[in-house]
Amino acid sequence: HSEGTFTSDYSKYLDNRRAKDFVQWLMNT
C-alpha cells in the first residue's frame, strides 16, 4: 500500500529532522 510506505518514509524524515535539530541544540548549548 503506497499510503503506508509514504507514512513510514515521512516518519523517518521527521526522525532525521528531529535528530538534526537536537544536535544543533546540543551544539548551541
Swiss-Prot record:
It is found in: Secreted. Induction: Produced in the A cells of the islets of Langerhans in response to a drop in blood sugar concentration. Pfam families: Hormone_2. The gene is gcg. It comes from Torpedo marmorata. This is Glucagon. PANTHER family: GLUCAGON, PRO-GLUCAGON. PROSITE patterns: GLUCAGON (PS00260). SMART domains: GLUCA (SM00070). Keywords: Hormone, Secreted. GO terms for biological process: adenylate cyclase-modulating G protein-coupled receptor signaling pathway; negative regulation of apoptotic process; positive regulation of insulin secretion involved in cellular response to glucose stimulus; protein kinase A signaling. Its main location: secreted. Promotes hydrolysis of glycogen and lipids, and raises the blood sugar level. The lineage of its organism: Eukaryota, Metazoa, Chordata, Craniata, Vertebrata. GO terms for molecular function: glucagon receptor binding; hormone activity. The keyword Nucleotide-binding does not apply. Belongs to the glucagon family. GO terms for cellular component: extracellular space. The keyword Chloroplast does not apply.
